[in-house]
């Protein structure tokens, strides 16, 4: 699988920005520069919705969307759509699809003047915005669609996110508008979809291995299985001679990937196999830096239980605690500080 060999922004001399700036459209590194060194896989993070968010936050589009969300007639149409597929939201249920009712309702939606105006304006903005081009291209990629489906399935099993997704399913446009204005929810959704965080490289990984282009490295099976949470595949790779501490071109080991993604079982398998918990990548980030920055609390606990150092600094002189603070991972900060003072 191809990897991004661009210069890692952690080496930048720029000063850190504020927390609010770190939530802007481009993820910030520990030194305040844009993240450019991506984990193996897609160079463009198809799950970073920040560009689309900026378009949807356009005052005129937001005003129209809010009007539609509050429009009783439009909400009635949304209810009709839900009734046309009555079992769609039930776990394990097969939809009882009423095609005629669905088509009739969609025709009414499309003839709603406000909806048509908003859709046309939004469509024009999306097509004309150069920053949205890679987003649209990525979602036409079958690998991205498969990865999206996989992440959505995980989100529906997440105890924190499941109630939110259920409410959006049940509440329609009004529920969507409610959560679109909630930065904490957007942050959780972004983390669940693998969006990058401040202080660390982009985490995006494609669901299937790509053919390595000339001059680019191919991702090892150990790295790939650890990234995707394939426990049995990882065990098989190690049993067949895979190197538990193999490094990619950026110096990252399988444990870096497993901890960055929160793949606890894979991290445990690697540690049981003797993987170094204090391995450093080319920017001196340890697996604990990754787990802390991405808020993977269980992986942080596992690493600490197995002797991971809390005080090691990366090239930007940031400890795992610093990276956790930079990304507002408060529960992780408490855990790390407790260990540091033992």
Swiss-Prot record:
How does the protein associate with the membrane? Answer: Peripheral membrane protein
Which intervals carry biased composition (Low complexity)? 27-37
Q: So where does this one cross the membrane?
A: none
Q: Has keyword Nucleotide-binding?
A: no
Q: What is its main location?
A: cytoplasm
**What mutagenesis or variant effect is reported for residue 25 to F?**
In akr2a-1; small plants with small and curled rosette leaves, as well as delayed flowering, especially in chilling temperature conditions
Give the coiled coil ranges: none
The tissues in which it is expressed are: Ubiquitously expressed at basal level.
Tell me a GO cellular component.
cytoplasm
Region described as Disordered? 1-41
Q: Where are the ANK repeats?
A: 217-246, 250-279, 283-312, 316-342
Domain of life, per the record? Answer: Eukaryota
Q: Which residues bind a 1,2-diacyl-sn-glycero-3-phospho-(1'-sn-glycerol)?
A: 294, 296
Q: If researchers knock out this gene, what phenotype do they report?
A: Lethal chlorotic phenotype when homozygote. Reduced levels of chloroplast proteins, including outer envelope membrane (OEM) proteins. Defective chloroplast biogenesis. Reduced APX3 levels and reduced targeting of APX3 to peroxisomes. Compromised peroxisomal function leading to increased sensitivity to aminotriazole during seed germination and shorter hypocotyls in darkness in the absence of sucrose.
List the Gene3D superfamilies hit by this protein, alphabetically: 1.10.260.100, Ankyrin repeat-containing domain (1.25.40.20)
Q: How does it assemble?
A: Interacts with TOM20-4, CYTB5-E, CBR1, APX3, APX5, TOC34 and GRF6. Binds to chloroplast outer envelope membrane (OEM) protein targeting signals, as well as to chloroplasts. Interacts with OEP7. Binds to HSP17.8 via its ankyrin repeats, this interaction enhances chaperone activity and chloroplast binding. Also interacts with HSP17.4A, HSP17.6A and HSP18.1. Binds specifically to two chloroplast glycolipids, monogalactosyldiacylglycerol (MGDG) and phosphatidylglycerol (PG).
Stated role: Exhibits chaperone activity toward chloroplast outer envelope membrane, mitochondrion outer membrane, endoplasmic reticulum membrane and peroxisomal proteins, by recruiting specific proteins containing a single transmembrane associated with an AKR2A-binding sequence (ABS) and subsequently binding glycolipids (e.g. monogalactosyldiacylglycerol (MGDG) and phosphatidylglycerol (PG)) present in the membrane of the target organelle.
Domain notes for this protein: The ankyrin repeats (ANK) mediate interactions with hexoses-containing lipids present in organellar membranes (e.g. chloroplast), such as monogalactosyldiacylglycerol (MGDG) and phosphatidylglycerol (PG).
User: What name goes with this protein?
Assistant: Ankyrin repeat domain-containing protein 2A
Provide the taxonomic classification: Eukaryota, Viridiplantae, Streptophyta, Embryophyta, Tracheophyta
């Amino acid at each position: 699988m191809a990897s991004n060999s661009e210069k890692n922004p952690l080496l930048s001399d720029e000063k850190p920005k504020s927390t609010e700036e770190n939530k802007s459209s481009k993820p910030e590194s520990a030194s305040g520069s844009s993240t450019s060194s991506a984990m193996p896989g897609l160079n463009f993070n198809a799950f970073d919705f920040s560009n689309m968010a900026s378009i949807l936050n356009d005052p005129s589009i937001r005003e129209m969307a809010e009007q539609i969300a509050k429009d009783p007639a439009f909400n009635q149409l949304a209810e009709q759509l839900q009734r046309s597929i009555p079992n769609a939201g039930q776990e394990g249920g097969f939809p009882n699809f009423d095609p005629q009712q669905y088509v009739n309702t969609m025709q009414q939606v499309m003839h709603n003047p406000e909806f048509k105006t908003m859709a046309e304006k939004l469509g024009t903005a999306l097509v004309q915005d150069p920053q949205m081009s890679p987003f649209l291209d990525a979602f036409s990629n079958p690998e991205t669609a498969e990865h999206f489906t996989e992440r959505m399935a995980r989100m529906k099993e997440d105890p924190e996110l499941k109630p939110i997704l259920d409410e959006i399913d049940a509440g329609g446009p009004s529920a969507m508008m409610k959560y679109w204005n909630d930065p904490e929810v957007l942050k959780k959704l972004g983390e669940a979809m693998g969006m990058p965080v401040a202080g660390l490289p982009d985490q995006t990984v494609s669901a299937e291995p790509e053919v390595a282009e000339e001059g680019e490295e191919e991702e090892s099976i150990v790295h790939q299985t650890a990234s995707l949470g394939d426990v049995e595949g990882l065990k098989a790779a190690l049993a067949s001679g895979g190197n538990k501490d193999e490094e990619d071109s950026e110096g990252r080991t399988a444990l870096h990937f497993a901890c960055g993604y929160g793949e606890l079982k894979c991290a445990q398998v690697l540690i049981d196999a003797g993987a170094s918990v204090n391995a450093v990548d080319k920017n001196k980030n340890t697996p604990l830096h990754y787990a802390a920055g991405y808020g993977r609390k269980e992986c942080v606990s596992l690493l600490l239980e197995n002797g991971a150092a809390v005080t090691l600094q990366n090239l930007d002189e940031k400890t795992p605690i610093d990276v956790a603070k930079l990304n507002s991972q408060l529960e992780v900060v408490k855990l790390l500080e407790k260990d540091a003072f033992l």
